[in-house]
Amino acid sequence: MQSPIKLFKKIFYKTSKYSQAGQDLFALELFGNGGSYIDIGSGCPKENSNTYLLEVDHQWKGFGVEIVKSVKNLWDKCPERKNAIYWDDATTLDYKKIVVENNLSS
């Protein structure tokens, strides 16, 4: 495994076209293709998304949680996002149930 400083430099000097600060590239570098995620505060489906690149280009499975329903129309227009998104308060969800529903349990 790379040292944290080398890993940081590798990620810092790359830029993602999707996430704000390379969070997607950081996760991809650490875990590779086919990972899992829970994205709380998903926001827009593509712009500033920490999970778009992972889901669409690298076969990650997971789900998002977003309370701001005004971005739902953007998700409806983004068919490449196949993983579930829950339009709810993240503090009230039954995550164990959702993980099972989405076949994410190991």
Regions found by a protein language model. Name each.
Residues 15-97:
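SAM cofactor-binding core of SAM-dependent methyltransferases
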Residues 95-105:
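Short amphipathic alpha-helix with an adjacent loop that forms part of the alpha/beta core around
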Residues 2, 68, 80, 103-105:
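Short, structured coil/loop segments at alpha-helix boundaries
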Residues 1-18, 22:
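Membrane-proximal basic amphipathic "stem/tether" segments
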Residues 35, 105-106:
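Conserved acidic residues
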